[in-house]
A protein has these predicted regions:
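Short acidic active-site motifs
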Residues: 25, 50, 83
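Short, ordered loop/turn segments at secondary-structure junctions
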Residues: 20-21, 42, 82-83
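Short alpha-helix adjacent to the SAM-binding motif of class I
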Residues: 27-29
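Short alpha-helical
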Residues: 22-25, 61-62
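ATP-dependent carboxylate-amine ligase
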Residues: 1-22, 31-37, 50-54, 72-75
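Short amphipathic alpha-helix with an adjacent loop that forms part of the alpha/beta core around
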Residues: 41-50
């Protein structure tokens, strides 16, 4: 999730987050971008109607106080894969799958796209 937070931040979106624990290297990377939460854990008061969306980590429990508050406020709530789909649904997508060679194939495709002058984004 921290890579998504950093990517959104780099895209000029206002980003906040929370988790029960944040480990290295995520902690240092978030700190360097000014995105490290001020404390570990969840607090319902951090969720208000000004938020555009909530993106849940895969370990978020149904009784998470921030999730409950977001539901109470009727906020848009996405899982990580749902959010990735939402932001890319109008884009042409290339999916590379298989047992071996996915990262290498992805790098080759990106290299070709870059040299062809085609703007691209990627997710590995």
């Amino acid at each position: 999730m921290h890579n998504l937070a950093i990517a959104l931040h780099n895209g000029k979106h206002q980003v906040t987050g929370s988790d029960d624990q944040i480990f290295e290297p995520s902690r240092s990377r978030l700190l360097a971008k000014g995105l490290l939460p001020p404390f570990d854990g969840w607090e319902a008061s951090r969720i208000d109607s000004q938020l555009d969306a909530i993106i849940l980590g895969m370990h978020a429990r149904k009784d998470n106080p921030e999730l409950l508050r977001a539901q109470e406020l009727g906020l848009n709530i996405f899982s990580y894969p749902e959010f990735l789909f939402e932001i890319s649904k109008e884009m042409t997508r290339v999916v590379i799958a298989g047992s071996h060679g996915k990262t290498t194939t992805t790098a080759m495709v990106l290299h070709v796209m870059h040299h062809a002058g085609v703007p691209t984004n990627y997710m590995v």
